[in-house]
């Protein structure tokens, strides 16, 4: 394994030629095929974790495929004829898809090593838990309670594919890899219908890598300017991917930036800034005044439009005052709530009460959007009244019950951190009654008659693991039930979100 590590080092011109291992290094295929990156680096690749790797994509097959395509001169195929031209029994589009997958795997290897390099020599405990979606909420509860404003930014997508190619140029020195990458990208996609007709056949792993490269380019500039202008040392930039000749290019850019926009650079000197990116959006929390928040807003607009050539409207940047507005974050509605606290103090023979006010981040369930999602999937109507799931009546009773129980437990598992469980109980009620109506419709019976025949054992299946455990911890009393209603639990094993219906 140490031998593999030597060939995968990021530094050096030879390692920048990404087509070199694709063509000549057979043993690198094993690393890419069985996700051997976790052996080289304890922090597995983000790209490998976020997407499913289909076993049919073999690096050895792709290598042989490229050689045969060169021999038969089949590379030059018009995009409109991709589906009509067959090659070895498959359409040419299928082979471009295979090549794109393996290209992404090979390019991920040095980036994965660079991602883990800042953690070398540091003790990072429970790094797996840091990948959880819920791990960000305890951080926000601790930090956002001291901030005034939050900037909610929708990260724009590059419309033209050439912008993605130009972004990758900063990191890849190998010209042949770039030309091959551009060729496959244009042949694989009809870029005029990039988000419509070709969406079903696009490879998620390939374009996830392109999107992350584009976003990391933006974040590298943002954090670099903040680090250069701040008096406090920022360590957030360490986990970002540094592009080739980055400092030389940014120093020139910073010089122009200072000469033309000295006032805008001044706003970057605020050391109390927290930045979080999620689901194509980013959140910037700070203690600044409304005037400075508006400057931040137009700074992002100018950065995207002038430097990245991406059309970006100011309406995509929302300024939220946490004490008044709700921040929609990862399926929760977060806002600051004043929590009154009465403390009894006693000095010698005198006792008195002290009224304190504690600012707390309140995370609530967006019941309207969840009911809208349930209505879209035919679990209820738009008013939240449960209806039978007609498309599931052909399945067996156990299959229907398991589907509803799985969906109910997933929702309960994710929204267990809500400060108030009333909306969560309402969602559970909708799913339970929808399950009963679906089973009653299958057996051509009424809901009351079906429940009378089956008993209460059906509803016990919907009890989640946390409900059963907490009911054993707290005694069955009014105050215990009220305490259970307010218990907030954040789980550190939730790495991604799935569709409600299609999740298996």
Swiss-Prot record:
Nucleotide-binding keyword on record: no
Keywords in alphabetical order: Chloroplast, mRNA processing, Plastid, RNA-binding, tRNA processing
Any one cellular-component term (Gene Ontology): chloroplast
Compartment(s) of residence: Plastid, Chloroplast
Any one Gene Ontology molecular-function term assigned to this protein's record: RNA binding
GO biological process, one term: mRNA processing
InterPro entries: Domain_X, Maturase_MatK, Maturase_MatK_N
Organism superkingdom: Eukaryota
Principal subcellular localization: plastid
Short name of any one Pfam family annotated for the protein: Intron_maturas2
Presence of keyword Secreted: no
Signal peptide: none
Family: Belongs to the intron maturase 2 family. MatK subfamily.
Function of the molecule: Usually encoded in the trnK tRNA gene intron. Probably assists in splicing its own and other chloroplast group II introns.
Protein name: Maturase K
